[in-house]
Amino acid sequence: MTKEQAESFLHTAESIHALSCKTPKQREENCREGIKSCAPDALLQVIKTVMERREERARQGKKLTLLDLHFIEQAEDILYEELAISLSISRVEVEEKIKAYAS
């Protein structure tokens, strides 16, 4: 990914929505496919999906499942490292930029 592609992706991050899944099995399959694709849009969808699930489970007084933790860690590692390299900034700065643009 070039620097220009990375900057363009950050500016479109807000318009990328979480995956819409009817069943837990479907969510799991969609997350696996998104991570396997390594496409920035798909990775951000996985991250947003798991973040929504984290909020939902917190409202129920539950923790995030290990599988969901695994999905978000993988997606964040791939996406944040790719953007950090492309933009020549640290991973922490990438996380801050994603949060600023995606919210």
Which residues does each PLM region occupy?
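Charge/polar-rich, low-complexity and marginally structured segments
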Residues: 1-103
